[in-house]
Amino acid sequence: MPPIVAIVGRPNVGKSTLFNRLTRGRRAITHDLPGVTRDRLEAPAEIEGRFVTLVDTGGMDYEAEESLARQIVEQAEAALVTADVVLFLVDGKAGRTALEDDLAERLRRLGKPVIVAVNKVDGLERVAAMTADFHAWGLPLLAISAAHGQGMAELAEAIAERLPEAEPYDPDAPLVQTVLRLAVLGRPNAGKSSLINALVGESRLIVSDIAGTTRDAVDVVVHQKGKRYLFVDTAGVRKRTRITDGLERYSVAKALSSAKRADVAVVVIDATGGVGVQDKRLISFLDSERKAFLVAVNKTDLVPQKDMLALQKDIARELRMCSHVPVLYMSAAKGKGVAKVLPQAEAIWAECQIRIGTGELNRAMRASLDKHQPPLVNGRRAKFYYLTQAADAPPTFVFFVSDTERVRDSYIKYLENSLRKLFGIATAPVKVVCRASHKPKDER
């Protein structure tokens, strides 16, 4: 397991900017507003030839009384417990604060290597003036500019010097590979973080009744039965008219981008609110992208039993255009029904990998084509010559026909349903494409 380097500090000192700089990617959301990072983010980074896990934490404010602020501090403290090296980031322009004096003393008591990185120091001539105050702590100190990349080489060297010795390579050690990458989507406060916490078995993500608690896409690894699952907990997707700032707009865009990169998406719906407009749009987006997904109806413990049948009918009605999508009913807070999520996602992904030979495809589909021929369009009927599977994930089938304009959407849906029935594709998305082609020479 690679050593862990945690970045901590008060709000808005540039922790996420430094995180993005060291991981060589714009992975954490950065913004001028304090408190942008709420959960702790993890990503691999290479420091002086050593691979480490870098952890970005939310701003630590021990004086804050709000529940959300306290949970942010708890997440940061959890990162400190597992850290091998701590980067204590401070703002050189703002100077030392009483809050940071308190935090410095707490870090000293940890007994772990701590490096004070004085950020926002632009220009060598200002180093002495902007770092003078921070020497009072008696901790190793460096001046950097995360935004402009200044001092990064010195910082990397200081980190590398404090890393624990690398574990010897064991060629017989079993390799644990990621089975699935899953994106968790849904409206704000639907219970996405609660679902992941229930699967992990700890409060890995901040859970709050304040809508919009999660702003970044946070990767969380779940180990179950010797398998490794990578979950991405995403910002809530809400109506455009309710997105009040640029930060939240970027969070939503990143959530949808995470869904595209995932193997399987999990759409979390709040059972107490039913299927909302944004739930419908999100499902429509995933269906149009032919993305593998399942629906997790959360908070069923808060729905009276007499209303459950109406809820199930409502969800079935909204999924009628993508009836292959599995629906799970659960209560993440109570831990009920959660155990079905990973096996179901794995089953969907297994179907996404299906490969069918061209000969087998054509023999099996010939009966379906003969039984239900394409309808006449302007007095003529499209001729189907042959088909082949062009790709998997999702399974994509290309039909070569005489005239694509004579193939109606309803007939394409019939072809999709026939393929599902013939080859046992029950829960994965299926993509059917018709391509114009001349009649094969051996049929002329």
Swiss-Prot record:
InterPro entries, per the entry: G_ENGA, GTP-bd, GTPase_Der, KH_dom-like, KH_dom-like_a/b, P-loop_NTPase, Small_GTP-bd
Signal peptide: none
Pfam families (alphabetical): KH_dom-like, MMR_HSR1
One term of GO molecular function: GTP binding
Disulfide pairings: none
Domain KH-like: 354-438
Domain EngA-type G: 3-167, 180-353
UniProt: GTP 1 binding residues: 9-16, 56-60, 119-122
Binding site for GTP 2: 186-193, 233-237, 298-301
PROSITE patterns (alphabetical): G_ENGA
GO BP: any one term: ribosome biogenesis
Keywords per UniProt: GTP-binding, Nucleotide-binding, Repeat, Ribosome biogenesis
Coiled coil regions, renumbered to chain: none
Superkingdom of this protein's organism: Bacteria
Functional note: GTPase that plays an essential role in the late steps of ribosome biogenesis.
Subunit field text: Associates with the 50S ribosomal subunit.
Protein family membership: Belongs to the TRAFAC class TrmE-Era-EngA-EngB-Septin-like GTPase superfamily. EngA (Der) GTPase family.
Protein name, entry field: GTPase Der
Originating species: Solidesulfovibrio magneticus (strain ATCC 700980 / DSM 13731 / RS-1) (Desulfovibrio magneticus)
